[in-house]
Amino acid sequence: MKFIILTCLLAVALAKQESKDNSQEDFKQTVDVVIFPGQETVKNIPIPQMESVEAPIKNKCYQSIQTFKPPQALKGLYQYHMAKNPWGYTVNRAFPSTRTLQYNQKTMDLSMRAREKIVMSEIKKNIQDYVTKMKQYSKITWPRFVKSLQQYQKTMNPWSCYPYTLLQV
């Protein structure tokens, strides 16, 4: 072990001495050369560092992505609005809930509006009673496989539908 350490130290010492000798020879060669200064001034010309060709292209791509701003209508197009259901499964809604609608960068809070007394006709009262009765049926717990089916609903937009023609009979 001592022998290995000794040889390593000896090799390093010889390498340093050899590099000193080389640098002294270079210095002796440059001392013999005489340079007469000219009338023009010497300017420091910066040498550009070597850069890969791909770097500017990547920078341009990233800059264009960062500066691209999609229209306001397209921002929420593919966002799935998740609502946690109290019965233990998640429902994807096709449209945002009313509290998340935005108009001119300001959120609309529907609870801030003044409540007005609404006069309803008999038909509207019957419809409202029917809706409240149907809410009772929505509280029925479904089996686990039905819960998982409702999680993967896709929102519909005009670009995801296939055009079809009606058959004339």
From Swiss-Prot:
It is found in: Secreted. Its main location: secreted. Residues 1-15 form the signal peptide. InterPro entries: Alpha-s2_casein (IPR011175), Casein (IPR001588), Casein_CS (IPR031305). Mammary gland specific. Secreted in milk. Disulfide bonds: none annotated. Keywords: Milk protein, Secreted, Signal. One of its GO terms (cellular component) is extracellular space. Belongs to the alpha-casein family. This is Alpha-S2-casein-like B. The lineage of its organism: Eukaryota, Metazoa, Chordata, Craniata, Vertebrata. The gene is Csn1s2b.
